[in-house]
């Protein structure tokens, strides 16, 4: 363990010394990925006013398309109600979950071949496993507290 700690400290010291020996400009340039073939670096004394006049100027109006821009709202209208794919069962319906899961498991024959069909099939398997786990948990809790249903809150 001590060997790894010494190795880690030596590695840290080597990288910090290497970064101290480099000029700061080189460190800055290394941290930014650049394409040198697309860039021409000129100093201030090399650029003349003739070169600037030969450059085509690109204004903001040239960059904007002249086509009509249509912006659609991502908000729902008030008359649209979101629909739940799987409604949340109420406490009274927890007892009949086995029959409900069998009713919702009816799929078309070719539905399992599509991605949506596979997703629906996996969702039904997860729901079935969750229902079984919930039923087993409730039975276990009832066995731990057999008289819990008889307890009434004091008023």
Swiss-Prot record:
<keyword id="KW-0597">Phosphoprotein</keyword>
<dbReference type="InterPro" id="IPR007906">
    <property type="entry name" value="GLYCAM-1"/>
</dbReference>
<keyword id="KW-0732">Signal</keyword>
<feature type="modified residue" description="Phosphoserine">
    <location>
        <position position="57"/>
    </location>
</feature>
<feature type="modified residue" description="Phosphoserine">
    <location>
        <position position="65"/>
    </location>
</feature>
<comment type="similarity">
    <text>Belongs to the PP3/GlyCAM-1 family.</text>
</comment>
<feature type="region of interest" description="Disordered">
    <location>
        <begin position="74"/>
        <end position="109"/>
    </location>
</feature>
<feature type="modified residue" description="Phosphoserine">
    <location>
        <position position="59"/>
    </location>
</feature>
<feature type="compositionally biased region" description="Polar residues">
    <location>
        <begin position="90"/>
        <end position="101"/>
    </location>
</feature>
<dbReference type="GO" id="GO:0005576">
    <property type="term" value="C:extracellular region"/>
</dbReference>
<feature type="signal peptide">
    <location>
        <begin position="1"/>
        <end position="18"/>
    </location>
</feature>
<dbReference type="Pfam" id="PF05242">
    <property type="entry name" value="GLYCAM-1"/>
</dbReference>
<feature type="modified residue" description="Phosphoserine">
    <location>
        <position position="53"/>
    </location>
</feature>
<feature type="modified residue" description="Phosphoserine">
    <location>
        <position position="48"/>
    </location>
</feature>
<keyword id="KW-0325">Glycoprotein</keyword>
<feature type="glycosylation site" description="O-linked (GalNAc...) threonine">
    <location>
        <position position="34"/>
    </location>
</feature>
<protein>
    <recommendedName>
        <fullName>Glycosylation-dependent cell adhesion molecule 1</fullName>
    </recommendedName>
</protein>
